[in-house]
Protein backbone atom coordinates (compact mmCIF):
# COMPACT_ATOMS: atom_id res chain seq x y z
CA UNK A 1 0.00 0.00 0.00
CA UNK A 2 1.34 3.41 -0.92
CA UNK A 3 2.10 6.00 1.79
CA UNK A 4 -0.71 8.28 0.74
CA UNK A 5 -3.28 5.50 0.92
CA UNK A 6 -2.03 4.67 4.40
CA UNK A 7 -2.53 8.28 5.42
CA UNK A 8 -6.02 8.39 3.97
CA UNK A 9 -7.16 5.36 5.89
CA UNK A 10 -5.29 6.44 9.00
CA UNK A 11 -7.13 9.74 8.89
CA UNK A 12 -10.47 8.04 8.43
CA UNK A 13 -9.58 5.47 11.05
CA UNK A 14 -8.78 8.22 13.53
CA UNK A 15 -12.16 9.80 12.83
CA UNK A 16 -14.05 6.55 13.37
CA UNK A 17 -12.04 5.61 16.44
CA UNK A 18 -12.65 8.93 18.13
CA UNK A 19 -16.33 8.90 17.28
CA UNK A 20 -16.72 5.30 18.37
CA UNK A 21 -15.23 6.23 21.71
CA UNK A 22 -17.72 9.04 22.08
CA UNK A 23 -20.91 7.15 21.28
CA UNK A 24 -21.83 6.85 24.94
CA UNK A 25 -21.84 9.95 27.10
CA UNK A 26 -22.96 9.63 30.72
CA UNK A 27 -24.77 6.42 29.86
CA UNK A 28 -26.75 8.01 27.00
CA UNK A 29 -26.78 5.84 23.90
CA UNK A 30 -25.85 7.23 20.49
CA UNK A 31 -29.41 6.97 19.10
CA UNK A 32 -30.69 9.01 22.03
CA UNK A 33 -28.09 11.71 21.40
CA UNK A 34 -28.94 11.73 17.72
CA UNK A 35 -32.63 12.11 18.52
CA UNK A 36 -31.89 15.17 20.65
CA UNK A 37 -30.25 16.89 17.68
CA UNK A 38 -33.05 16.08 15.23
CA UNK A 39 -35.41 18.80 16.41
CA UNK A 40 -36.99 21.22 13.99
CA UNK A 41 -34.66 24.14 13.23
CA UNK A 42 -36.55 27.37 12.57
CA UNK A 43 -33.58 28.75 10.61
CA UNK A 44 -34.69 26.72 7.60
CA UNK A 45 -38.08 28.46 7.47
CA UNK A 46 -37.96 31.63 5.32
CA UNK A 47 -39.61 34.89 6.42
CA UNK A 48 -42.93 35.93 4.92
CA UNK A 49 -42.67 37.43 1.45
CA UNK A 50 -39.53 35.49 0.60
CA UNK A 51 -40.96 34.43 -2.77
CA UNK A 52 -40.47 37.94 -4.15
CA UNK A 53 -36.74 37.94 -3.36
CA UNK A 54 -34.23 37.64 -6.20
CA UNK A 55 -32.40 34.33 -6.79
CA UNK A 56 -29.34 34.29 -4.56
CA UNK A 57 -30.73 36.86 -2.13
CA UNK A 58 -29.87 36.10 1.50
CA UNK A 59 -33.02 35.64 3.61
CA UNK A 60 -31.36 34.78 6.93
CA UNK A 61 -27.86 34.17 8.25
CA UNK A 62 -26.12 32.86 11.34
CA UNK A 63 -22.59 32.19 12.55
CA UNK A 64 -21.91 28.54 13.28
CA UNK A 65 -19.19 26.20 14.45
CA UNK A 66 -18.34 23.41 12.03
CA UNK A 67 -16.76 20.04 12.72
CA UNK A 68 -16.39 18.17 9.43
CA UNK A 69 -15.76 14.73 10.88
CA UNK A 70 -17.96 15.41 13.91
CA UNK A 71 -14.97 15.47 16.22
CA UNK A 72 -13.49 18.93 16.77
CA UNK A 73 -14.46 22.40 15.60
CA UNK A 74 -12.45 23.71 12.66
CA UNK A 75 -10.29 26.75 13.29
CA UNK A 76 -12.16 29.00 10.85
CA UNK A 77 -15.12 31.34 10.72
CA UNK A 78 -18.27 29.79 9.32
CA UNK A 79 -21.71 31.07 8.43
CA UNK A 80 -24.92 29.54 7.21
CA UNK A 81 -27.05 31.45 4.72
CA UNK A 82 -30.69 30.78 3.91
CA UNK A 83 -31.22 32.04 0.39
CA UNK A 84 -33.84 32.18 -2.31
CA UNK A 85 -33.26 29.93 -5.30
CA UNK A 86 -35.18 28.32 -8.16
CA UNK A 87 -36.73 24.87 -8.46
CA UNK A 88 -36.86 22.73 -11.57
CA UNK A 89 -38.05 25.51 -13.86
CA UNK A 90 -37.49 29.25 -14.11
CA UNK A 91 -39.84 31.21 -11.89
CA UNK A 92 -40.40 28.33 -9.46
CA UNK A 93 -39.31 29.87 -6.18
CA UNK A 94 -37.78 27.77 -3.42
CA UNK A 95 -35.03 28.11 -0.81
CA UNK A 96 -31.87 26.39 0.29
CA UNK A 97 -29.02 26.80 2.77
CA UNK A 98 -25.30 27.05 2.15
CA UNK A 99 -22.53 26.72 4.73
CA UNK A 100 -19.76 29.23 4.05
CA UNK A 101 -16.29 28.37 5.37
CA UNK A 102 -13.96 31.34 5.73
CA UNK A 103 -10.29 30.67 6.53
CA UNK A 104 -7.98 33.19 8.14
CA UNK A 105 -6.17 35.55 5.75
CA UNK A 106 -8.61 34.62 2.99
CA UNK A 107 -8.58 35.95 -0.56
CA UNK A 108 -11.52 38.24 -1.22
CA UNK A 109 -11.44 37.58 -4.94
CA UNK A 110 -11.79 33.78 -4.87
CA UNK A 111 -14.73 31.58 -3.92
CA UNK A 112 -14.96 27.84 -4.43
CA UNK A 113 -18.28 25.96 -4.34
CA UNK A 114 -18.11 22.37 -3.14
CA UNK A 115 -21.00 20.09 -4.09
CA UNK A 116 -20.72 17.31 -1.54
CA UNK A 117 -22.60 14.20 -2.50
CA UNK A 118 -25.46 13.25 -0.18
CA UNK A 119 -27.07 10.75 -2.57
CA UNK A 120 -30.04 10.46 -0.25
CA UNK A 121 -33.70 11.39 0.12
CA UNK A 122 -33.46 12.47 3.77
CA UNK A 123 -33.42 15.99 5.20
CA UNK A 124 -31.04 14.91 7.97
CA UNK A 125 -28.29 14.22 5.44
CA UNK A 126 -27.94 17.79 4.16
CA UNK A 127 -24.40 19.23 4.42
CA UNK A 128 -25.64 22.21 6.45
CA UNK A 129 -26.82 19.83 9.16
CA UNK A 130 -23.89 17.45 8.98
CA UNK A 131 -21.16 20.11 9.01
CA UNK A 132 -22.66 22.03 11.91
CA UNK A 133 -21.21 21.01 15.25
CA UNK A 134 -23.50 18.73 17.22
CA UNK A 135 -24.28 16.09 14.60
CA UNK A 136 -22.69 12.69 14.60
CA UNK A 137 -20.59 11.03 11.93
CA UNK A 138 -22.82 7.94 12.00
CA UNK A 139 -25.65 9.97 10.47
CA UNK A 140 -23.86 10.70 7.21
CA UNK A 141 -20.42 9.19 6.83
CA UNK A 142 -20.32 10.35 3.20
CA UNK A 143 -20.42 14.05 4.06
CA UNK A 144 -18.05 13.54 6.99
CA UNK A 145 -15.19 12.01 5.01
CA UNK A 146 -15.66 14.29 1.99
CA UNK A 147 -15.31 17.28 4.24
CA UNK A 148 -11.74 16.27 5.09
CA UNK A 149 -10.75 17.64 1.67
CA UNK A 150 -12.33 20.98 2.53
CA UNK A 151 -9.45 21.81 4.87
CA UNK A 152 -7.00 21.48 1.97
CA UNK A 153 -9.05 23.99 -0.02
CA UNK A 154 -9.24 26.33 2.96
CA UNK A 155 -5.46 26.29 3.35
CA UNK A 156 -5.30 27.79 -0.14
CA UNK A 157 -6.98 30.87 1.31
CA UNK A 158 -10.19 30.30 -0.63
CA UNK A 159 -13.65 30.93 0.75
CA UNK A 160 -15.54 27.64 0.36
CA UNK A 161 -19.32 27.55 0.12
CA UNK A 162 -21.09 24.20 0.59
CA UNK A 163 -24.73 24.28 -0.53
CA UNK A 164 -27.57 21.94 0.30
CA UNK A 165 -27.98 21.43 -3.42
CA UNK A 166 -30.85 18.96 -3.09
CA UNK A 167 -33.02 21.72 -1.65
CA UNK A 168 -35.68 21.51 1.08
CA UNK A 169 -37.42 18.52 -0.55
CA UNK A 170 -34.20 16.52 -0.73
CA UNK A 171 -34.56 16.14 -4.49
CA UNK A 172 -31.56 13.91 -5.20
CA UNK A 173 -31.17 13.58 -8.96
CA UNK A 174 -33.30 16.60 -9.92
CA UNK A 175 -30.46 18.17 -11.90
CA UNK A 176 -31.80 21.63 -12.83
CA UNK A 177 -32.98 22.26 -9.27
CA UNK A 178 -29.57 21.25 -7.92
CA UNK A 179 -27.75 23.38 -10.50
CA UNK A 180 -29.84 26.43 -9.58
CA UNK A 181 -29.14 25.84 -5.88
CA UNK A 182 -25.38 25.74 -6.50
CA UNK A 183 -25.30 28.91 -8.60
CA UNK A 184 -27.51 30.78 -6.15
CA UNK A 185 -25.33 29.61 -3.25
CA UNK A 186 -22.42 31.37 -4.95
CA UNK A 187 -24.55 34.48 -5.46
CA UNK A 188 -25.58 34.44 -1.79
CA UNK A 189 -21.98 33.98 -0.64
CA UNK A 190 -20.79 36.93 -2.74
CA UNK A 191 -23.78 39.03 -1.64
CA UNK A 192 -23.15 38.41 2.06
CA UNK A 193 -21.59 41.65 3.30
CA UNK A 194 -20.03 40.13 6.40
CA UNK A 195 -17.51 38.26 4.24
CA UNK A 196 -16.81 41.12 1.85
CA UNK A 197 -16.09 39.24 -1.36
CA UNK A 198 -15.72 41.27 -4.52
CA UNK A 199 -18.67 41.23 -6.92
CA UNK A 200 -16.35 39.95 -9.66
CA UNK A 201 -14.67 37.29 -7.51
CA UNK A 202 -13.36 34.29 -9.42
CA UNK A 203 -15.48 31.18 -8.92
CA UNK A 204 -14.57 27.49 -9.23
CA UNK A 205 -16.58 24.40 -8.37
CA UNK A 206 -15.93 20.76 -7.50
CA UNK A 207 -18.18 17.74 -7.10
CA UNK A 208 -17.86 13.97 -7.26
CA UNK A 209 -20.49 11.30 -7.93
CA UNK A 210 -23.89 12.73 -6.94
CA UNK A 211 -22.16 16.04 -6.31
CA UNK A 212 -20.76 15.94 -9.86
CA UNK A 213 -24.23 15.40 -11.26
CA UNK A 214 -25.41 18.55 -9.46
CA UNK A 215 -22.28 20.48 -10.46
CA UNK A 216 -22.65 19.40 -14.08
CA UNK A 217 -26.04 21.07 -14.10
CA UNK A 218 -24.61 24.21 -12.50
CA UNK A 219 -21.97 24.32 -15.25
CA UNK A 220 -24.63 23.82 -17.92
CA UNK A 221 -26.97 26.49 -16.56
CA UNK A 222 -24.33 29.09 -15.68
CA UNK A 223 -24.48 30.98 -18.96
CA UNK A 224 -28.29 31.21 -19.09
CA UNK A 225 -29.10 31.49 -15.38
CA UNK A 226 -26.22 33.29 -13.64
CA UNK A 227 -23.99 34.73 -16.35
CA UNK A 228 -22.80 37.55 -14.09
CA UNK A 229 -20.80 35.05 -12.02
CA UNK A 230 -17.11 35.04 -12.97
CA UNK A 231 -16.76 31.26 -13.16
CA UNK A 232 -13.26 30.17 -14.21
CA UNK A 233 -13.50 26.39 -13.91
CA UNK A 234 -15.48 23.30 -12.92
CA UNK A 235 -14.07 19.95 -11.74
CA UNK A 236 -16.30 16.88 -11.62
CA UNK A 237 -15.83 13.13 -11.60
CA UNK A 238 -17.82 9.90 -11.51
CA UNK A 239 -20.63 11.88 -13.11
CA UNK A 240 -24.15 10.59 -13.77
CA UNK A 241 -25.19 12.23 -17.04
CA UNK A 242 -28.15 10.09 -18.21
CA UNK A 243 -30.68 9.43 -15.47
CA UNK A 244 -32.81 6.74 -17.14
CA UNK A 245 -29.74 4.76 -18.20
CA UNK A 246 -28.26 5.00 -14.72
CA UNK A 247 -31.46 3.91 -12.95
CA UNK A 248 -31.80 0.95 -15.31
CA UNK A 249 -28.16 0.04 -14.66
CA UNK A 250 -28.05 0.48 -10.88
CA UNK A 251 -31.43 -0.96 -9.85
CA UNK A 252 -31.17 -4.52 -8.55
CA UNK A 253 -27.43 -4.21 -7.86
CA UNK A 254 -25.50 -3.47 -4.70
CA UNK A 255 -26.23 0.19 -5.42
CA UNK A 256 -30.01 -0.24 -5.63
CA UNK A 257 -30.41 2.20 -2.74
CA UNK A 258 -29.35 4.94 -5.16
CA UNK A 259 -32.34 4.10 -7.37
CA UNK A 260 -34.71 4.37 -4.41
CA UNK A 261 -33.27 7.73 -3.34
CA UNK A 262 -33.12 9.17 -6.87
CA UNK A 263 -36.61 8.15 -7.92
CA UNK A 264 -37.96 9.32 -4.58
CA UNK A 265 -36.12 12.63 -4.84
CA UNK A 266 -37.10 13.40 -8.43
CA UNK A 267 -40.73 12.35 -8.02
CA UNK A 268 -41.05 14.66 -5.01
CA UNK A 269 -40.54 17.74 -7.22
CA UNK A 270 -41.37 16.63 -10.78
CA UNK A 271 -45.09 16.50 -11.54
CA UNK A 272 -44.40 14.20 -14.49
CA UNK A 273 -43.24 11.50 -12.06
CA UNK A 274 -45.58 12.16 -9.15
CA UNK A 275 -47.53 9.05 -10.21
CA UNK A 276 -44.71 6.87 -8.91
CA UNK A 277 -45.40 7.95 -5.32
CA UNK A 278 -49.16 7.89 -5.91
CA UNK A 279 -48.96 4.23 -6.96
CA UNK A 280 -46.69 2.79 -4.29
CA UNK A 281 -47.58 -0.66 -2.99
CA UNK A 282 -47.67 -1.17 0.80
CA UNK A 283 -44.09 -2.48 0.61
CA UNK A 284 -43.07 0.44 -1.61
CA UNK A 285 -44.44 2.90 0.95
CA UNK A 286 -42.37 1.27 3.66
CA UNK A 287 -39.18 1.37 1.58
CA UNK A 288 -39.63 5.00 0.52
CA UNK A 289 -40.48 6.07 4.06
CA UNK A 290 -37.31 4.39 5.34
CA UNK A 291 -35.34 6.17 2.64
CA UNK A 292 -36.65 9.51 3.91
CA UNK A 293 -34.87 8.81 7.18
CA UNK A 294 -31.68 7.16 5.90
CA UNK A 295 -28.44 8.68 4.69
CA UNK A 296 -26.53 7.14 1.83
CA UNK A 297 -24.72 4.19 3.40
CA UNK A 298 -27.66 3.05 5.51
CA UNK A 299 -29.90 3.24 2.46
CA UNK A 300 -27.42 1.24 0.38
CA UNK A 301 -27.12 -1.46 3.04
CA UNK A 302 -30.87 -1.84 3.47
CA UNK A 303 -31.82 -1.85 -0.22
CA UNK A 304 -28.87 -3.71 -1.76
CA UNK A 305 -29.77 -6.04 -4.65
CA UNK A 306 -33.49 -5.25 -4.46
CA UNK A 307 -35.27 -4.28 -7.66
CA UNK A 308 -37.19 -1.18 -6.61
CA UNK A 309 -38.33 -0.31 -10.13
CA UNK A 310 -40.82 -3.18 -10.30
CA UNK A 311 -44.47 -3.91 -9.58
CA UNK A 312 -43.39 -5.16 -6.17
CA UNK A 313 -42.84 -1.57 -5.07
CA UNK A 314 -45.10 0.55 -7.30
CA UNK A 315 -47.76 -0.14 -9.89
CA UNK A 316 -46.28 0.25 -13.34
CA UNK A 317 -42.77 -0.38 -12.08
CA UNK A 318 -42.13 -3.44 -14.24
CA UNK A 319 -42.88 -1.48 -17.43
CA UNK A 320 -41.37 1.79 -16.19
CA UNK A 321 -38.60 1.93 -18.79
CA UNK A 322 -41.09 1.24 -21.61
CA UNK A 323 -43.39 4.03 -20.39
CA UNK A 324 -43.01 6.98 -22.78
CA UNK A 325 -44.16 9.46 -20.12
CA UNK A 326 -41.58 8.22 -17.64
CA UNK A 327 -38.82 8.35 -20.23
CA UNK A 328 -39.84 11.87 -21.27
CA UNK A 329 -39.59 12.93 -17.63
CA UNK A 330 -36.21 11.29 -17.00
CA UNK A 331 -34.68 12.52 -20.25
CA UNK A 332 -35.02 16.07 -18.90
CA UNK A 333 -32.11 15.15 -16.60
CA UNK A 334 -29.64 14.22 -19.36
CA UNK A 335 -26.49 16.33 -19.62
CA UNK A 336 -24.86 17.21 -22.92
CA UNK A 337 -27.87 16.98 -25.23
CA UNK A 338 -29.23 20.54 -25.14
CA UNK A 339 -27.10 22.97 -27.15
CA UNK A 340 -28.36 25.88 -25.03
CA UNK A 341 -26.93 24.26 -21.89
CA UNK A 342 -23.20 24.00 -22.52
CA UNK A 343 -20.52 24.99 -19.96
CA UNK A 344 -18.82 28.28 -20.81
CA UNK A 345 -15.91 27.85 -18.35
CA UNK A 346 -13.23 25.12 -18.62
CA UNK A 347 -14.31 21.73 -17.28
CA UNK A 348 -12.09 19.00 -15.82
CA UNK A 349 -13.97 15.70 -15.93
CA UNK A 350 -12.45 12.43 -14.73
CA UNK A 351 -13.76 8.89 -14.52
CA UNK A 352 -12.45 5.42 -13.75
CA UNK A 353 -12.84 3.16 -16.77
CA UNK A 354 -13.77 0.29 -14.44
CA UNK A 355 -16.34 2.24 -12.42
CA UNK A 356 -19.18 -0.17 -11.58
CA UNK A 357 -21.39 2.43 -9.87
CA UNK A 358 -21.60 5.04 -12.64
CA UNK A 359 -20.84 3.69 -16.14
CA UNK A 360 -17.81 5.28 -17.76
CA UNK A 361 -19.37 5.45 -21.24
CA UNK A 362 -22.15 7.86 -20.31
CA UNK A 363 -19.77 10.42 -18.82
CA UNK A 364 -17.37 10.14 -21.75
CA UNK A 365 -20.24 10.64 -24.21
CA UNK A 366 -21.30 13.81 -22.42
CA UNK A 367 -17.75 15.15 -22.44
CA UNK A 368 -17.47 14.56 -26.20
CA UNK A 369 -20.88 16.12 -26.81
CA UNK A 370 -19.93 19.23 -24.85
CA UNK A 371 -16.67 19.45 -26.78
CA UNK A 372 -18.49 19.25 -30.09
CA UNK A 373 -20.68 22.13 -28.93
CA UNK A 374 -17.71 24.37 -28.17
CA UNK A 375 -16.98 23.69 -24.50
CA UNK A 376 -13.44 23.48 -23.11
CA UNK A 377 -13.19 19.96 -21.71
CA UNK A 378 -10.40 17.85 -20.26
CA UNK A 379 -11.74 14.33 -19.78
CA UNK A 380 -9.20 12.21 -17.91
CA UNK A 381 -9.61 8.44 -17.94
CA UNK A 382 -8.20 6.53 -14.97
CA UNK A 383 -7.51 3.22 -16.72
CA UNK A 384 -5.86 1.16 -13.96
CA UNK A 385 -7.69 -2.07 -13.13
CA UNK A 386 -7.70 -1.14 -9.44
CA UNK A 387 -9.42 2.20 -10.05
CA UNK A 388 -13.15 2.15 -9.32
CA UNK A 389 -15.77 4.65 -8.25
CA UNK A 390 -14.61 5.07 -4.65
CA UNK A 391 -10.86 4.90 -5.28
CA UNK A 392 -11.06 7.39 -8.16
CA UNK A 393 -12.92 9.81 -5.91
CA UNK A 394 -10.02 9.80 -3.45
CA UNK A 395 -7.08 9.40 -5.83
CA UNK A 396 -8.22 12.29 -8.02
CA UNK A 397 -8.08 14.92 -5.27
CA UNK A 398 -4.54 16.19 -6.06
CA UNK A 399 -5.48 16.49 -9.74
CA UNK A 400 -8.57 18.44 -8.72
CA UNK A 401 -6.51 20.75 -6.52
CA UNK A 402 -4.01 21.45 -9.32
CA UNK A 403 -6.85 22.23 -11.72
CA UNK A 404 -8.53 24.63 -9.28
CA UNK A 405 -5.24 26.40 -8.56
CA UNK A 406 -4.52 26.77 -12.27
CA UNK A 407 -7.93 28.21 -12.97
CA UNK A 408 -7.71 30.73 -10.13
CA UNK A 409 -4.21 31.70 -11.28
CA UNK A 410 -5.31 32.20 -14.89
CA UNK A 411 -3.07 29.49 -16.35
CA UNK A 412 -3.53 29.02 -20.09
CA UNK A 413 -5.90 26.15 -20.87
CA UNK A 414 -4.32 24.69 -24.00
CA UNK A 415 -6.28 22.60 -26.50
CA UNK A 416 -10.04 23.01 -26.31
CA UNK A 417 -10.73 19.28 -26.00
CA UNK A 418 -8.32 16.99 -24.15
CA UNK A 419 -8.67 13.26 -23.45
CA UNK A 420 -5.66 12.10 -21.40
CA UNK A 421 -5.49 8.51 -20.17
CA UNK A 422 -3.51 7.62 -17.04
CA UNK A 423 -3.21 4.26 -15.38
CA UNK A 424 -3.47 5.39 -11.81
CA UNK A 425 -2.93 8.79 -10.15
CA UNK A 426 -1.42 6.95 -7.16
CA UNK A 427 1.74 6.58 -9.27
CA UNK A 428 2.11 10.32 -9.86
CA UNK A 429 5.07 11.10 -7.60
CA UNK A 430 4.34 14.81 -7.75
CA UNK A 431 0.86 14.15 -6.38
CA UNK A 432 2.18 11.64 -3.85
CA UNK A 433 4.59 14.04 -2.21
CA UNK A 434 2.11 16.88 -2.05
CA UNK A 435 -0.67 14.67 -0.74
CA UNK A 436 1.50 13.29 2.04
CA UNK A 437 1.88 16.78 3.47
CA UNK A 438 -1.77 17.64 2.89
CA UNK A 439 -3.17 14.64 4.74
CA UNK A 440 -0.86 15.25 7.69
CA UNK A 441 -2.10 18.83 7.58
CA UNK A 442 -5.70 17.62 7.63
CA UNK A 443 -5.09 15.53 10.73
CA UNK A 444 -3.78 18.62 12.49
CA UNK A 445 -6.79 20.58 11.27
CA UNK A 446 -9.14 18.07 12.86
CA UNK A 447 -7.40 18.66 16.17
CA UNK A 448 -8.44 22.30 16.07
CA UNK A 449 -5.51 24.11 14.47
CA UNK A 450 -6.29 27.52 13.00
CA UNK A 451 -6.89 27.16 9.26
CA UNK A 452 -5.95 29.58 6.53
CA UNK A 453 -3.00 30.86 4.56
CA UNK A 454 0.00 30.69 6.87
CA UNK A 455 0.87 34.03 8.42
CA UNK A 456 4.46 33.90 7.18
CA UNK A 457 3.14 33.61 3.61
CA UNK A 458 0.89 36.59 4.22
CA UNK A 459 3.76 38.63 5.64
CA UNK A 460 6.05 37.72 2.75
CA UNK A 461 3.47 38.88 0.23
CA UNK A 462 2.90 42.14 2.06
CA UNK A 463 6.64 42.74 2.20
CA UNK A 464 6.78 42.36 -1.59
CA UNK A 465 3.77 44.67 -1.90
CA UNK A 466 1.77 41.82 -3.41
CA UNK A 467 -1.95 41.40 -2.88
CA UNK A 468 -2.42 38.68 -0.21
Curated annotation (Swiss-Prot):
Listed EC numbers: 3.1.1.-, 3.1.1.3
Disulphide linkage map: 125-295
Location in the cell: Secreted; Secreted, Cell wall
Signal peptide positions on this chain: 1-21
Keyword Hydrolase: yes
Keyword field contains Repressor: no
Substrates-to-products reaction catalysed: a triacylglycerol + H2O = a diacylglycerol + a fatty acid + H(+); a monoacylglycerol + H2O = glycerol + a fatty acid + H(+); a diacylglycerol + H2O = a monoacylglycerol + a fatty acid + H(+)
EC class: hydrolase
One Gene Ontology term, aspect cellular component: extracellular region
Active site positions: 209 (nucleophile), 355, 389
Assigned keywords, A-Z: Cell wall, Disulfide bond, Hydrolase, Lipid degradation, Lipid metabolism, Secreted, Signal, Virulence
An example Gene Ontology biological process: lipid catabolic process
Pfam families (UniProt xref): LIP
GO molecular function, one term: triacylglycerol lipase activity
InterPro entries: AB_hydrolase_fold (IPR029058), Lipase_secreted (IPR005152)
Main subcellular localisation: secreted
Family of this protein: Belongs to the AB hydrolase superfamily. Lipase family. Class Lip subfamily.
Purpose of the protein: Secreted lipase involved in Dandruff and seborrheic dermatitis (D/SD) probably via lipase-mediated breakdown of sebaceous lipids and release of irritating free fatty acids. Has triacylglycerol lipase activity and is able to hydrolyze triolein. Mostly converts monoolein to di- and triolein, while free fatty acids are only produced in low amounts.
Protein name, UniProt field: Secreted triacylglycerol lipase LIP7
Organism of provenance: Malassezia globosa (strain ATCC MYA-4612 / CBS 7966)
Amino acid sequence: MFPRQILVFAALGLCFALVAGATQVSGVRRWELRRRFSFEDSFYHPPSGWESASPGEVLASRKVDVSPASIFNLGINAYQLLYRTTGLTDGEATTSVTTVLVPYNYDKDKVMVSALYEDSFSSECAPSKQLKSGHFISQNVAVAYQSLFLTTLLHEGWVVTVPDHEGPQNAFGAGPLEGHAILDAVRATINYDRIGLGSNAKVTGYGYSGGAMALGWAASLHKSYASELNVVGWAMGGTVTRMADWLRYIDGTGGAGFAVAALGGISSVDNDLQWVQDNLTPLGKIVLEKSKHSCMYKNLLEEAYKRFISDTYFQGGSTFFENSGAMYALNKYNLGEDGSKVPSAPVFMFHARNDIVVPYAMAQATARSWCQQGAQIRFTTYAGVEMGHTSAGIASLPDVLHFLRDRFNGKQWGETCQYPVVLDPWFNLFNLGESYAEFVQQLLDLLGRRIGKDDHILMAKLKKQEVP
